[in-house]
Amino acid sequence: MTTGPLPRRVALISVHTSPLAQPGTGDAGGMNVYVWQTATRLARRGVEVEIFTRATSSSDAPRVAAAPRVTVRNVVAGPFEGLDKRDLPAQLCAFTAGVLRAEAAQEPGYYDLIHSHYWLSGQVGWLARDRWGVPLVHTAHTLAAVKNASLAAGDTAEPQLRVIGEQQVVDEADRLIANTETEASELISMYGADPARIDVVTPGADLDCYTPGPREMARTSLGLDQNEAIVTFVGRIQPLKAPDLLIEAAAPLIRRSRTSRRPVRVLIVGGPSGSGLDRPTALIDLAHDLGIADAVTFLPPQAPARLADVYRASNLVAVPSHSESFGLVAIEAQACGTPVLAADVGGLSVAVAGGRTGVLVGSHAVGDWTNALEKALAQPDRLAEMGRNARVHAEQFSWDHTVDAMLSSYSRAMQSFAARNPDAAQSVAAQNVTGSSSRTRRPWRRRRSTLLPMTGRS
């Protein structure tokens, strides 16, 4: 339980994607879910949350009361449509100006803490932290150096601009939140992060939405055959997530099972994103070329309640990603009692209990995935046992647990920041005793600026 100072109001920064967007297409994915779920649960603990995100439509209201104590501020920065995420660094000045102007319209000391999500937001948070005189907590969600070390075929490497930008944020943030111990180790080994400033805060799932249920009812609601063995991919369609690997690996099984009592079907749920936008029909073309187009079903991104039915309808959910800082899909599927076949990369080894709630595959070779799929589907009793274990495993990963750990990180950030800034220490003490929001604006300052060469870093 957190015993130190806690913020009254937090500015969450999510530049490139809104928590109100539908996950599974464009730039909306697990981070959207993370920001929304943690924001609403922080609000339930009495913390006011304001989320700054870039407006993507002229109809976006400047302020949206999204939930009790949760406000989304849509900041105009660049054109509403047609702006690729790779072009967003050029709009960070405009976005930062919008954030600073919003705060300037309030009384001094309006926000107690900034929590930035993804490196673009970290750049904004770094400047706002120095302007407002409050601590900055940063969650990377993904790291360029990690992604570039495990690129999928046909994927585009993250630019050096991002690597440098991430390095700056890692150096500047008061605390860094990593999804897993693996990500914490990557921050230390690849970015030279101070281990003492890292908190491991594991993401969760909405355990009230994602629950086990009758497979027959779920399949009926989705119009799926009751007799098929269904293997499902959920996520953005891009090389990093490797849905093509699943289709290629399943192809031999689909061909061999056509005349059996239990034919195999692949279900792809999501929309194109990132470099996947360059070839939006690539997966459809692949299924056609492999002669299995009739056994591959495509669905658009689904709302949570509908997505829960997708998980329940599946015999197995596949997460073949080349890189994954955690893997929310894996936890959501297991919460619904569905076992997971996942690549043994990043946080997936935490999200999936290999051999107990699913299977971890140690390579991205098509043959290895075909063998893993065949072995899993050939043992329905074993899959059923894994499904029962999966729900128990998933119950360790609630968003309430996530927010408990997040608030502890916030408290440490506020304490360490106050220790370095005597005026901040007095402000925190006054806040805890009186609940007063009266604080004088502190002058612009830089805590450190240590951009190091990207080679030869110790």
From Swiss-Prot:
GO terms for biological process: mycothiol biosynthetic process. 1D-myo-inositol 3-phosphate binds at H16, D27, A28, G29, G30, M31, N32, K85, Y118, T142, R162. Coiled coil: none annotated. Its EC number is 2.4.1.250. Disulfide bonds: none annotated. Mg(2+) binds at Y311, R312, S314, T338. UDP-N-acetyl-alpha-D-glucosamine binds at Q22, P23, G30, R236, K241, Q302, E324, E332. Residues 439-449 have a biased composition (Basic residues). It comes from the Bacteria. It is an enzyme of class 2 (transferase). It catalyses: 1D-myo-inositol 3-phosphate + UDP-N-acetyl-alpha-D-glucosamine = 1D-myo-inositol 2-acetamido-2-deoxy-alpha-D-glucopyranoside 3-phosphate + UDP + H(+). The keyword Metal-binding applies. Catalyzes the transfer of a N-acetyl-glucosamine moiety to 1D-myo-inositol 3-phosphate to produce 1D-myo-inositol 2-acetamido-2-deoxy-glucopyranoside 3-phosphate in the mycothiol biosynthesis pathway. Homodimer. Belongs to the glycosyltransferase group 1 family. MshA subfamily. This is D-inositol 3-phosphate glycosyltransferase. It comes from Gordonia bronchialis (strain ATCC 25592 / DSM 43247 / BCRC 13721 / JCM 3198 / KCTC 3076 / NBRC 16047 / NCTC 10667). The lineage of its organism: Bacteria, Bacillati, Actinomycetota, Actinomycetes, Mycobacteriales. The gene is mshA.
